Amino acid sequence: MSTETSVRIRGMLSIIGDLERIGDIYYQISKEIERKVEEKVWFTPEQRNNLTEMFSILEKSLDVMNHNLTLDYSAVSITKAKELENQLNAKRDTIKKQHFKDIEKGSYSIKSAGVYSNLFHSLEKIGDHIINVTEGLVGEV
């Protein structure tokens, strides 16, 4: 087996694992949202807006990933995918910093804080797996 073939196979196996993990995390998010509804946990407008922004960045990231999956390996560019991953990480960092301040101030309940934290961390993990898919395509595994 050639080195190039070996790199592609390793990339494909990595991609399969990352796509499966993305599905698993979305399932965990759905269970967290079910728990939020069942326990009547409410988010502040700021919490909702922050999560909406993260979902928006993820949607763009998924679009880039899906587009890259349709291309020949040699045509895949990782630039846009990394840019979106950096945006998502920056948003997570901003949310996390404010989240700790809000907990200290008692801006929302502990239940709300827990669900919110689980959601924004899960969304960031999805972003990690999305960038891993493109890295697998370009041989950066």
Placement of each model-derived feature along the sequence:
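Cytosolic, long alpha-helical scaffolding segments
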Residues: 1-141
